[in-house]
């Protein structure tokens, strides 16, 4: 791409409760400062001092070793048994260890993401379907990107914004605002221009779509106020927000996936757009469209099960009990 135009640089929309430090106690600020110090000198700076592949390998080995001893590992095992009831215990354990390894690689690569931009010579990020982004930009009409926690989800946002395409990227703000600002700065360094945390609500996303700006959302985690929609054969509470926004603005949903090809090497794919279901019953149309998104997510996971975020409690405990995986 020879077009060097970029959307508004460094725009960062933060939740009010995290940014209003006047309401924070001295103890909270001291705690945040200590955590940020540890972040800098135990994790970020040491990994940044290593080569990209060395950092990826180092943290992957650490998490593959300590991850199985955590409570999150037990949740992961239950989730895998829910999704793959025919797997042997060995298959479940091997996939769980692979998921820890993948998460470790993501963490190790984070300080180096500015070196991993797509659309440059010898890029570590292969992009399939990038022409869809060019079509969106030429149309001057927004889309709602939907994706999940596949492989290294950070590089999917980079593939959108570095094309470039004006897009608001949603994310979960870190509880520590000092660390959150460090992460935001790193994201800006590899091309993510407009960040919107989930705490900012849907109003900001509606404004973005209203002015023709695309939005991107992760739609694969539990949302207690959502819809019970099948996921790997079990009802999972799923956010209908992306679907509702797409329907309101008559925008297509464009699924994205990411697959790890090796240490710090990825393939990002922009898939065929999905139009929201046209059923005249709006609630039925929303359900059917959310089901399509869940089916897409499930299909991507099945291609590389160890590259998804199994640590998350995707199903409620009642579903675990019903499936006999407690």
Predicted features along the sequence, with ranges:
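Non-catalytic C-terminal accessory region of glycerolipid acyltransferases
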Residues: 2-18, 23, 28, 86, ...
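Membrane-anchoring hydrophobic helices of lipid-metabolizing enzymes
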Residues: 2-147, 181
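Hydrophobic alpha-helical segments typical of transmembrane helices
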Residues: 42, 54, 76, 156, ...
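Short, composition-biased local secondary-structure segments
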Residues: 45-50, 152-157, 203-216
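Active-site metal-coordination segments of metallo-dependent hydrolases
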Residues: 74-75, 176-177, 236-239
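Catalytic core of membrane glycerolipid acyltransferases/transacylases, capturing the structured
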Residues: 105, 137-199, 224-229, 260
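Short, flexible loop segments at the rims of nucleotide/cofactor-binding pockets, characterized by
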Residues: 120-125, 172, 191-197, 231-233, ...
């Amino acid at each position: 791409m020879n077009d060097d135009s970029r959307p508004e640089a460094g725009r960062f929309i933060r939740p009010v409760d995290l940014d209003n430090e006047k309401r924070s106690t001295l103890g909270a600020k001291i705690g945040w400062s200590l955590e940020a110090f540890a972040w800098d000198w135990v994790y970020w700076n040491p990994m940044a001092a290593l080569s990209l592949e060395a950092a990826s390998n180092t943290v992957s080995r650490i998490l593959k070793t300590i991850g199985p001893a955590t409570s999150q590992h037990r949740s992961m095992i239950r989730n895998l048994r829910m999704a793959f009831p025919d797997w042997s215990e060995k298959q479940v354990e091997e996939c769980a260890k692979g998921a820890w390894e993948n998460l470790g690689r993501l963490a190790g690569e984070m300080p180096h993401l500015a070196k991993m931009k797509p659309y440059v010579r010898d890029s570590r990020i292969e992009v399939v379907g990038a022409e869809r982004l060019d079509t969106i930009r030429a149309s001057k009409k927004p889309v709602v990107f939907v994706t999940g926690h596949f492989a290294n989800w950070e590089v999917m946002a980079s593939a959108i914004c570095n094309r470039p395409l004006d897009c608001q990227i949603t994310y979960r703000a870190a509880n520590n605002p000092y660390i959150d600002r460090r992460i935001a700065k790193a994201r800006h360094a590899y091309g993510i221009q407009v960040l919107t945390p989930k705490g900012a609500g849907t109003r900001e996303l509606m404004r973005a779509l209203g002015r023709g700006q695309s939005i991107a959302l992760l739609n694969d985690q539990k949302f207690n106020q959502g819809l019970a929609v099948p996921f790997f054969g079990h009802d999972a509470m799923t956010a209908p927000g992306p679907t509702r926004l797409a329907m309101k603005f008559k925008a297509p949903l464009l699924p994205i996936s990411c697959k790890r090809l090796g240490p710090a090497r990825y393939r990002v794919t922009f898939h065929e757009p999905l139009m929201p279901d046209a059923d005249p019953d709006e609630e039925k149309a929303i359900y059917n469209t959310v089901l399509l998104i869940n089916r897409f997510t499930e299909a991507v996971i099945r291609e590389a099960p160890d590259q998804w975020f199994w640590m998350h409690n995707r199903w409620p405990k009642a579903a675990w009990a019903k499936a006999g995986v407690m």
